[in-house]
From Swiss-Prot:
It is found in: Cytoplasm. Mg(2+) binds at S178, T198. The gene is obg. GO terms for molecular function: GTP binding; GTPase activity; magnesium ion binding. One of its GO terms (cellular component) is cytoplasm. SUPFAM superfamilies: Obg GTP-binding protein C-terminal domain, Obg GTP-binding protein N-terminal domain, P-loop containing nucleoside triphosphate hydrolases. This is GTPase Obg. Its main location: cytoplasm. It comes from Tropheryma whipplei (strain Twist) (Whipple's bacillus).
């Protein structure tokens, strides 16, 4: 194997995504012959580009995210005079393997991209600022200001790939799982006679009689796998979507008790936490396979095999003695797996084509007082602060009108605010002056 580099399998990464910023609006006045001030003609800024994750059958691993941990979409262009709106920022589409689960920083699952082509909008581009032509109205016929573009969303997300398979082969290292999947499908996993030869799941498609299903060869489990020992959590993750669990037991191994080994694996499966509505791993249909019967030569070894079959049949209905090398017993085994897969529903939930993260249903604003300063929080007022060009008195006046219409002035009165009190919104501090007509705030930077 010297000189050969095996592709790295990466199934869990944390990635930052930054959407594009919206372009600024333009404040300009149309000039015509004999009409030096013919009205506002500033265009609006373009929206920033958004970022989407798309499930792609050609992707098998998240290795590209390991090499690049931050993705950014392009910004929207600024508006121009003569009613020219800025171009929208280009959206960015990032491919991920089918079966990728997406989690926020708090560990909450946002989406499960299972179906090929399904998309998730992970961050939304910032809104472009309105030009003064769009702001013109009855009260302001020729506004001499425009709104600034908003920054795009930024998020840090955890991506996890969970294999999409109907059947999972589980067991201790070196029990022959890779040999079995190689014998019953066209998969070509690495096979060797030492532990942990398989370091990532191998998938194979099985066609047995009228049945067609997928099988995953899960890397060897050890005691404590459900707690992360021996990369156990990474391996158990790939069993979550399977309908059937196949316990592979090396019946020729005299160093380990097969029955206690089976119980230990069952314990690890029972302790692994699956999704809220999913069936626990140890409660799913299970099949026991006694592998490597081709090496059993003596009568004592044959008697041990019969004893194991009788014991396991008291625990599980389906028990098969097979040899991946001679292919003995594989036909009956694969047909039965097909029947079980058809009988039991898949744990994979199909996803819609495009998923948008819903906005949180929160009050328009809230008001509290800390250290003598009234603090206003809320999506709308904080967004308006970001849109305001504070070098323009007219823009500040427009902001004050919007805040007043939202009910912030009335809320300040009810809270006992008096003239001269400081009010903070989105990190900007104002001095409140309710006596000023149509503009309740004067800026105090």
């Amino acid at each position: 194997m010297s000189g050969i580099t095996l592709p790295e399998f990466v199934d869990c990464v944390t990635v930052e995504f930054s959407a594009g910023r919206g372009g600024n609006g333009c404040a300009s006045v149309r000039r015509e012959k004999y009409k030096p001030l013919a009205g506002p003609d500033g265009g609006s800024g373009g929206h920033g580009g958004s970022i989407f994750l798309k499930a792609d059958t050609s992707e098998r691993t998240l290795i590209s995210f390991r090499r690049k941990g931050h993705y950014s979409a392009s910004n929207g262009a600024h508006g121009l005079s003569r009613l020219r709106n800025g171009a929208r920022g280009k959206d960015l589409e990032v491919s991920v393997p089918c079966g990728t689960s997406v989690y926020d920083e708090g560990g909450r699952q946002i989406a499960d991209l299972v179906s090929p082509g399904s998309c998730l909008q992970v961050v939304r581009g910032g809104t472009g600022g309105l030009g003064n032509a769009a702001l013109a109205g009855y009260r302001r016929k020729t506004p001499r200001f425009a709104l600034l573009g908003l920054p795009g969303q930024k998020r840090k997300l955890r991506l996890e790939v969970k294999s999409i398979a109907d059947v999972a082969l589980v067991g201790f290292p070196s029990v022959g799982k890779s040999s079995i999947i190689s014998a019953i499908s066209s998969a070509k996993p690495k096979i060797a006679d030492y532990p942990f030869t398989t370091l990532h799941p191998n998938l194979g498609v099985v066609q047995s009689g009228p049945y067609r299903y997928t099988v995953a060869d899960v890397p060897g489990l050890v005691e404590g796998a459900s707690k992360g020992i021996g990369l156990g959590l990474n391996f158990l993750r790939h069993i979550e979507r399977c309908s059937v669990v196949v316990h592979v037991i090396d019946c020729a191994n005299t160093q380990q008790d097969p029955i206690s080994g089976f119980n230990l694996i069952e314990k690890e499966l029972s302790e692994y936490k699956v999704a809220e509505n999913a069936i626990p791993l140890n409660k799913r249909p299970k099949v026991i396979v006694l592998n490597k019967i081709d090496v059993l030569q003596t009568k004592e070894e044959q008697d041990t095999l019969l004893y194991l079959q009788s014991v396991f049949k008291k625990l599980v209905t389906d028990v098969y003695a097979i040899s991946a090398v001679t292919r003995s017993g594989l036909r009956q085994f694969t047909l039965r797996l097909g029947e079980i897969c058809q009988e039991y529903p898949s744990q994979v939930q199909p996803t819609s084509q495009t998923i948008l993260i819903p906005a949180k249903n929160t009050p328009e604003f809230s008001l509290d007082r800390t250290d003598g300063v009234y603090r206003v929080t809320g999506k709308k007022p904080e967004k308006w602060i970001l849109q305001t060009d504070f070098s323009s008195d007219e823009a500040i006046s427009y902001l004050a009108e919007r805040l007043d219409r939202l009910g912030i002035e009335d809320a300040l009165v009810r809270a006992g605010a008096t003239c001269g009190d400081e009010v903070e919104i989105g990190g900007v501090i104002f001095t409140w002056d309710p006596s000023v007509a149509n503009t309740s705030f004067s800026l105090s930077v």
